[in-house]
């Protein structure tokens, strides 16, 4: 399986009302219309190409990162790009809101998946354009049985908040080691062992929470997850216990998680997931949920203060489970900045 990095470059964030994306697209239409005949795309006889729009819609609820799903929690909201859609992102919004009754707010493009053999049949090539959306969870509704699920249901090895999950030592590493030992030559064996060490933080290498897609693709290549065995039923059940998804939707979800884990380190998108007012502990727990790692409390608060990301509201939380804490809000002027240069969240293993 090729990495998602082989797809299109990520696009800039899209405005909630879609104006900027539509304006850019409208400006490009006359240029396409005037293109010489020899530059117009050709279609191959007997073969079709279609565009599919897929949403990775994320919320953080009760300290858990959750993703909006369909079809008994085995699919992401998606639908074909149709002629009636005035732009890609307007088509995405139409499908998500039709299928889930959940409005979209912050949206940015992830990648374009166009690999062959994506499980979509050989008579048509489907280009899937994926988007990452951040929201606050609302009760799911609709005709497609939409539901919110923890993304650790699909990637249980990614949650390191309480230490290294047992599934890594008990299931993943023994099977991955066997995969490496089965290599036909010494060079490939060593290459596989190196990949395992880098992706899972072995042999003195640190755990990198951003390598979500690389870990998933390694498990796929080793044939350890259900998606890798669909065309080979004779292999029996996959040895790694985790929830699979239709087609390559779990690969797309892995791409979205990796993007968000990287983005929270340099851009204040985490505030899209929080209520209007929050405590610093709520902010910290939200970051930890997304990263799958704990952060150092004092360093985290010092960083937030240094970056001037929040301001006090003058009110206290009404949570009766402990001592009242100060309520903060996100400084809205930060929204006009493209990035917080140099911001790195202090993530620790403890």
Predicted regions and their residues:
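Charge-enriched amphipathic alpha-helical scaffolds
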Residues: 294-313
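N-terminal strand-loop-strand
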Residues: 36-75
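Intrinsically disordered, low-complexity segments enriched in serine/proline and basic residues
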Residues: 3-11
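NUDIX/MutT-family hydrolases
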Residues: 130-134, 141-264, 277-281, 300, ...
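Long, intrinsically disordered, low-complexity Ser/Thr/Pro-rich regulatory/activation regions
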Residues: 133, 308-350
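Conserved Nudix-box catalytic region and its N-terminal flanking loop in Nudix hydrolases
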Residues: 63-104, 110-116, 264-288
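Active-site-adjacent beta-strand/loop module that shapes the phosphate/pyrophosphate-binding cleft
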Residues: 117-142, 257, 326-334
């Amino acid at each position: 399986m090729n990495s998602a990095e082989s797809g299109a470059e990520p696009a800039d964030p899209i405005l909630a009302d879609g104006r900027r994306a539509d304006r850019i697209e409208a400006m490009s239409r006359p240029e396409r219309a005037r293109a010489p005949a020899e530059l117009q795309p050709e279609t191959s006889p007997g073969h079709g190409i279609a565009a599919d729009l897929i949403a990775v819609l994320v919320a953080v609820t009760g300290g858990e990162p959750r993703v909006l799903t369909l079809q008994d929690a085995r699919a992401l909201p998606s639908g074909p790009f149709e002629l009636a859609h005035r732009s890609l992102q307007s088509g995405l919004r139409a499908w998500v809101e039709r299928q889930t009754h959940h409005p979209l707010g912050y949206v940015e493009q992830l990648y374009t998946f166009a690999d062959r053999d994506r499980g979509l049949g050989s008579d048509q090539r489907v280009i899937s354009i994926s988007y990452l959306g951040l929201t606050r969870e609302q009760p799911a509704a609709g005709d497609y049985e939409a539901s919110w699920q923890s993304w650790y249901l699909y990637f249980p090895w990614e949650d390191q908040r309480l230490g290294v999950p047992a599934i890594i030592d008990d299931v993943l590493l023994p099977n991955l080691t066997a995969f490496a030992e089965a290599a036909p030559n010494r060079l490939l064996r060593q290459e596989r062992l190196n990949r395992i060490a880098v992706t899972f933080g072995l042999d003195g290498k640190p755990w990198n929470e951003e390598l979500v897609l690389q870990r998933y693709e390694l498990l796929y290549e080793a044939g350890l997850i259900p998606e890798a065995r669909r065309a080979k039923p004779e292999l029996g059940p996959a040895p790694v216990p985790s929830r699979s998804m239709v087609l390559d939707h779990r690969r797309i979800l892995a791409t979205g998680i990796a993007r968000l884990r990287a983005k929270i380190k340099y851009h204040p998108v985490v505030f899209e997931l929080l209520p209007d007012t929050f405590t610093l502990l709520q902010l910290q727990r939200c970051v930890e949920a997304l990263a799958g790692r704990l952060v150092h409390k004092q360093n985290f608060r010092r960083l937030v203060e240094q970056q001037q990301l929040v301001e006090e509201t003058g009110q206290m939380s009404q949570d009766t489970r402990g001592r009242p804490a100060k309520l903060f809000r996100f400084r809205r002027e930060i929204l006009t900045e493209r990035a917080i240069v140099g911001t790195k969240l202090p993530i620790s293993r403890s």
